[in-house]
């Protein structure tokens, strides 16, 4: 009986969290070519796996979208947010190097080296960098949660879907399951102020509009 009740409770939380993610992102998620004319010009790039100075598949696709939007004149400032520790592969340093190699000038890039997770990225973008309107780029399975968390921090945000060229089917399935069972419920609780995710505070960065 306890197992049944536990499974029922888990299913309920997963359903509510998925609904929260869908509602939070409704009308706020687009493909790169669908950006409206009045879209924000600040773009937040969420960090992901990096190793040996090279972005992993998920991160590379996000950065390619960021570089494309900058070259097209759709954004003028890019906030790279991730875990820049040695253990995490120096995500932010790798992101900057990749974007600069793709033609994005150094002055257009803002580094957030302690965006340890999506919630921390959204909170720091608002509190440390003064972001009020922004685009945020990530893969489709992640974008609803990212939009919901940034909206909870008061950012008028639009999610931009990055492709997943080169992603394996197994990794996609794993990420979709993790998103549904773990990440969305945790994000929903965080967005409503339950179980706030602890994070370190860095130095206050330049305001980004």
Where are the language model's segments positioned?
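N-terminal membrane-anchoring alpha-helices
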Residues: 1-38, 199-209
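A transmembrane-helix-recognition feature enriched in membrane-embedded lipid enzymes
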Residues: 169-199
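Residue-level signal for alpha-helical transmembrane segments in multi-pass membrane proteins
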Residues: 14-21, 44, 185-192
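A general structural signal for short secondary-structure boundary/capping elements
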Residues: 86-91, 158, 180-187, 203-208
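A structural signal for short, hydrophobic/glycine-enriched beta-strand patches
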Residues: 20-177
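Electropositive, surface-exposed helix/loop patches at the edges of structured domains
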Residues: 6, 114-122, 142-150, 192-209
């Amino acid at each position: 009986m306890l197992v049944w009740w536990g499974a029922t409770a888990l299913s309920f939380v997963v359903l509510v969290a998925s609904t929260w993610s869908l509602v939070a992102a409704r009308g706020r998620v687009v493909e790169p070519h669908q950006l409206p004319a009045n879209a924000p010009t600040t773009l937040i790039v969420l960090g992901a796996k990096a190793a040996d100075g090279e972005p992993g598949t998920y991160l590379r696709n996000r950065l390619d979208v960021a570089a494309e939007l900058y070259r097209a004149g759709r954004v003028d400032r890019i906030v790279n947010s991730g875990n820049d520790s040695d253990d995490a592969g120096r995500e932010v340093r790798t992101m900057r190097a990749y974007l600069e190699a793709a033609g994005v000038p150094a002055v257009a890039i803002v580094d957030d080296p302690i965006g340890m997770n999506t919630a921390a990225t959204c909170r720091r973008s608002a509190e440390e960098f003064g972001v009020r309107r922004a685009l945020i780029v990530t893969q489709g399975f992640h974008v609803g949660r990212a939009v919901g968390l940034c909206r909870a921090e008061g950012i008028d945000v639009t999610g931009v879907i990055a492709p997943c060229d080169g992603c394996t089917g197994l990794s996609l399935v794993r990420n979709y399951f993790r998103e549904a069972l773990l990440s969305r419920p945790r994000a929903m609780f965080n967005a409503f102020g339950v179980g706030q995710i602890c994070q370190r505070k860095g130095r206050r960065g330049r305001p980004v509009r």
